[in-house]
Amino acid sequence: GGVRNLGVPTVTDRFIQQAIAQVLTPIYEEQFHDHSYGFRPNRCAQQAILTALDMMNEGNDWIVDIDLEKFFDTVNHDKLMTIIGRTIKDGDVISIVRKYLVSGIMIDDEYEDSIVGTPQGGNLSPLLANIMLNELDKEMEKRGLNFVRYADDCIIMVGSEMSANRVMRNISRFIEEKLGLKVNMTKSRVDKPQGLKYLGFGFYFDLIAHQYKAKPHAKSVMKYKKRMRELTCRSWGVSNSYKVEKLNQLIRGWTNYFKIGSMKNLCRELDGNIRYRLRMCIWKHWKTPQNRAKNLMKLDVPRWAAYNIAYCGDRYARLAHNGWIQKAITTKRLTSFGLVSMLSLIHISEPTRP
C-alpha cells in the first residue's frame, strides 16, 4: 500500500516530454530485451504471461519473485543519466531529461525537490524506467536466466529451489549495489507457480494436459466481484439500462484482459452472479406488488403464480432464485436488454506474440 506522489506536467511540459519520448523510443527499442513487456509499443501483459508459461513448462518451475520497493520513487538520477549518456550524445537532450527528473512535485500546496526518482504522471517516466531496468535485463541474460519483466514487476524461472535461492541472493545484490535500487525482502520470495500472483494472474498445473496454465488470481476475482456488486447495488439510484451499460464496460475490460487464462467455468459462474443481481434490481424497479404481478404476466408467468410471488413478501435474494422469476427474466431477455456475457467473449483469439 501507500500513496504515490504524481508529478503531473503542464501542457507545455507534456508536449516537450512526448516529443523527447518519440525520439528516444525507437533508439532504445533496439536495445531493450525481448522479455521486457511493460510500456512498450505492441507489447502487453498477456504476452508476458504466455512467455512465462512457456518457461515454466520447459521445467523452470521454481519462481524468483523480486519486489522492487517504491521503484519509481527511488531511481538514482546520476546512475540513470550515466546509462542514458552511453547512448544519447546530444547535450541538449541530456540537459532536458535531467531537468525533468529534478523538476520537483507539489505536496499539500508546497513545492518539494526531486532528489531521487522519476516523477510519475509524465510521458517520459515509463521509458526512463525501462532504460534503467534494461540494465537488469542484460545482467539476467548474461547469467543465462529465464525471466519476464513488465515495468518493475519481474519474475525469474529456474529449475530447482536451490538455484532459485541462489538467484534471489545474487540478483538482489546486483539490484541494490549496481543499480542503487531497494529490494523489498519482505515481499520478495521463492515459490512454485501455484503460489505466484503475477500481473493479476494465478497459475496451476493441469494434470490432464500435464502443463502449467494461467487463470485469474483469486484476488483479481474478488476485486471484480466487489466492483460488480457496486454496479448492481439496488440502492444506486440510476436506471437499470445505465447499470447494464457500466456492467458491460467492466465485463469487456476484465474478460479481454484475462481471456488467455483458463476461465470457462469461472465465466459461467460470474455470468450467473450478474444475472442474479440484475433480477433483484429489476424486481425493485417494479416497486409495487400490483406492478410486479402485471410485469410478470407480461413475461408469460401465469396469473396465479404472478400474484403469489408479487405478494409473498420474500426477500430480494430469495426471490431472485425463484423459478418463475428466472423463467420470466431469462438469460435471453437480459441479453436482448443489452447485457454482455463473459462466456461469449473468452473465445476471441489470444494476443499476437512479439
What do these predicted ranges mean?
Residues 1, 28-32, 60-62, 76-78, ...:
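Short acidic (Asp/Glu) and glycine-rich catalytic loops that position anionic groups and cofactors
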Residues 5, 113-116, 229-242, 253-266, ...:
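Short, solvent-exposed helix-loop connector elements
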Residues 7, 11-21, 45, 49, ...:
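Duplex nucleic acid-engaging cores and interfaces of nucleic-acid transaction enzymes
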Residues 14, 18, 22, 26, ...:
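Short, residue-level hotspots on alpha-helical faces of the histone-fold
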Residues 31-43, 47-197:
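Conserved polymerase palm-domain catalytic core
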Residues 102, 178-246, 250-252:
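A conserved non-catalytic segment of reverse transcriptases
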Residues 259-311:
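Conserved nucleotidyltransferase catalytic core and NTase-mimicking acidic/glycine-rich helix/loop elements
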Residues 346-352:
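Conserved small/polar residues in nucleotide/adenosyl-binding loops
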